[in-house]
């Protein structure tokens, strides 16, 4: 039996063009195959067609937590503009009560203006969204203690708000940052930083410098790298599929703490499951 990759590997599973039963069944199969986490992105509409069928992130993750027993569930990543942070904290705390120690809160500033227009959600310029993110993370961390929380921020105001039962252990807050500002922000306020492999080499020095500037150590913030599978690679010919143990070890040597196979589509699932069987079977 293989001991599997040297760092955790999860799967960011498509939420477009599938139904909830398919998602839940696939999540259970990913758990059985040995994957560490199943992740959903937080969009309300597709980047292709606005009328594409699409599952909502957190309700899907709640259902996933209910039908699994080991695998972590998380957002890759939630848009800070989509929900008031106090409401999001309550949602995450509830799922964490159902699945203690298995919930991950990935959060970022968003980047899909069309869905904001469609749903009537404001979409200010990136600097304001980043400032809101900083304030939101503070609100969420405070509510994860259970409360009461009172705060008068620039955007969020709470008056003796509670989030009870408080999650134990406290879910990680992972900031998604694919630009220098995002990497710096993650280094300053997050428990984890997620970025895509295409930006990793350029952003890693920025992240490391920001960690040092914030007086934080490397062990304070997990580095989570999203890795795309080639489009149409249903046969699983990429290194992540053919030799997942060696592939993960190369990433560990480059400084990654965790990996996420990004946006795995329906026609790629069988190859991903087979790779898991080779890695952990």
Across the structure, where does each feature detected by a protein language model lie?
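Active-site-adjacent structural elements that line small-molecule/cofactor binding pockets in enzymes
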Residues: 1-281
């Amino acid at each position: 039996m293989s001991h599997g990759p040297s760092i955790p590997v999860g799967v960011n599973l498509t939420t477009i063009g599938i139904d909830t039963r398919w998602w839940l069944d696939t999540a259970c199969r990913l758990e059985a195959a040995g994957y560490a986490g199943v992740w959903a992105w937080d969009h309300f509409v597709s980047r292709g067609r606005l009328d594409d069928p699409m599952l909502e992130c957190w309700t899907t993750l709640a259902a996933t937590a209910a039908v699994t027993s080991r695998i972590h569930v998380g957002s890759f990543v939630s848009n800070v503009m989509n929900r008031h942070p106090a409401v999001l904290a309550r949602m995450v705390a509830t799922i964490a009560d159902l699945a203690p120690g298995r919930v991950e809160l990935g959060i970022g500033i968003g980047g899909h203006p069309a869905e904001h227009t469609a749903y009537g959600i404001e979409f200010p310029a990136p600097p304001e969204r980043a400032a809101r993110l900083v304030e939101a993370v503070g609100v969420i961390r405070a509510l994860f203690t259970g409360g009461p929380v009172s705060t008068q921020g620039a955007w969020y105001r709470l008056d003796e708000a509670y989030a009870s039962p408080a999650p134990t252990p406290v879910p990680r807050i992972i900031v998604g940052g694919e630009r220098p500002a995002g990497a710096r922000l993650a280094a300053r306020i997050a428990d984890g930083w997620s970025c895509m492999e295409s930006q990793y080499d350029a952003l890693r020095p920025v992240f490391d410098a920001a960690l040092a500037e914030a007086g934080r150590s490397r062990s304070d913030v997990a580095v989570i790298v999203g890795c795309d599978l080639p489009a149409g690679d249903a046969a699983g010919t990429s290194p992540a599929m053919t030799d997942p143990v060696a592939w993960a070890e190369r990433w560990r040597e480059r400084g990654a703490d965790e990996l996420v196979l990004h946006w795995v589509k329906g026609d790629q699932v069988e190859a991903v499951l087979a790779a898991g069987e080779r890695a952990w079977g």
